[in-house]
Regions:
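Alpha/beta catalytic cores of nucleotide-metabolism and tRNA/nucleoside-modifying enzymes
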Residues: 1-39, 219-308
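Well-ordered, non-membrane alpha-helical segments in soluble/globular domains
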Residues: 73-79, 102-108, 129-133, 165-167, ...
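Short low-complexity, flexible loop/linker segments enriched in glycine and/or proline
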Residues: 107-115, 159-160, 197-198, 217-220, ...
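N-terminal capping/small domains of soluble enzymes
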Residues: 1-125, 305
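Generic structural signal for short, solvent-exposed loop/turn connectors between secondary structure elements
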Residues: 18-58, 113-117, 126-127, 134-142, ...
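Short polybasic/polar patches that bind polyanions
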Residues: 86, 174, 295
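Alpha/beta enzyme core
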Residues: 83, 125-238, 245-267, 300-305
Length: 308
């Protein structure tokens, strides 16, 4: 574990977006963290009861440990994060970024724990994405594309990213030969892409409020559009502002089958090191429910991804 004492996360008791407003690079978001704050605040609007099944829980893909978190060593971050997530029983994800060290360190971290995970790639030009899919295959149980990241502020002017069409994504899906996820469903354009592509997994997300997109929360978008999205995808997942059991239940009530957890896992890792993420998940669910909610595609009895 190698953590810079001057990390950028404030270690808030509850991560709600209000202590790091507008900090980007950093832990905040665009529009003075407006969508980040809304993501955290609005799941409660859709909580009705505990009678729904818990959605599965997965670590969200996160990179940029040095510039965004203040971690001392970029590569080590992925090993520490993945190991702590395995200890917590979470299904795994890794992300992509610039430089390529970010993706390839994530792949190494999965190999280190002898696990597979969801690999979420940035929307690079097609040929580069084919190469990245190939490099990820041995460690991937799911291949995904962060389609909304073409407009991400932290990579602007550093690399060429593209707004992907359904045709572009269909070529990647065919090449991957694995369950294929589209992450970043948050606009009417995104819904049309899902309708044409029919992905195995559609992930409602506004990138944690870190990209310039429509204003609003993941919860409100799911409430308005999940049923329509579900008609054209195998599963619908959610990513954004999910912090506690009631949030998970609200997501489940809307039809979400799996949720991604991001910033709170970083906070937990920084606070309690290798035990942090387990302590965090156990504190909000309890050990028995943690076992129910956590699991990876390769080890839990998930439904097969039927073609819509």
């Amino acid at each position: 574990m190698s953590v810079n004492k001057k990390y950028k996360c404030r270690l808030c008791k509850e991560c709600n977006g209000k202590a790091c407003i507008g900090e980007l690079p950093g832990m905040g978001g665009v529009f003075e963290s407006a969508n980040f704050i809304l993501n955290c605040a609005e799941w409660k609007n859709y909580y009705t009861s505990d009678s729904y099944p818990l959605p599965r829980l997965r670590l969200a893909p996160m990179t940029g440990a040095v510039e965004n978190v203040g971690y001392e060593d970029e590569r080590q971050f992925y090993f520490d994060l993945i190991r702590a997530s395995v200890k917590a029983g979470l299904a795994l994800s890794i992300g992509d970024g610039y430089p390529d060290l970010k993706l390839f360190s994530g792949i190494e971290a999965l190999r280190d724990v002898k696990k597979k995970g969801a690999v979420f790639l940035k929307p690079y030009p097609q040929m580069k994405l084919f190469e990245r899919i190939e490099a990820s295959m041995e460690s991937a149980e799911i291949i995904g594309v962060d389609t909304d990241a073409y407009n991400i502020v932290t990579m602007r002017n550093l690399v060429h990213l593209e707004k992907k069409s359904a045709k572009d994504l269909a070529a990647l899906k065919k090449y991957a030969k694995l369950p294929f996820a589209v992450k970043g469903i948050f606009t009417s354009y995104d819904i049309e892409v899902v309708k044409e592509l029919k992905p195995d997994i559609a992930i409602i997300s506004n990138h944690g409020g870190r990209i310039e997109t429509d204003r609003g929360s993941v919860a409100a978008f799911a409430h308005s559009h999940l049923k329509e999205i579900k008609k054209y995808s195998g599963e619908v997942w959610a990513d954004g502002g999910l912090r506690k059991r009631e949030d998970f239940m609200a997501a489940s009530s809307l039809g979400v089958e799996e949720v991604l957890i991001g910033r709170p896992c970083i906070t937990a890792l920084l606070r309690d090191k290798e035990n942090g993420i387990k302590n965090f998940i156990d504190s909000i669910l309890g050990k028995d429910l943690t076992k129910e909610a956590c699991g990876s595609l390769g080890s839990s009895p998930l439904r097969s991804f039927e073609k819509p």
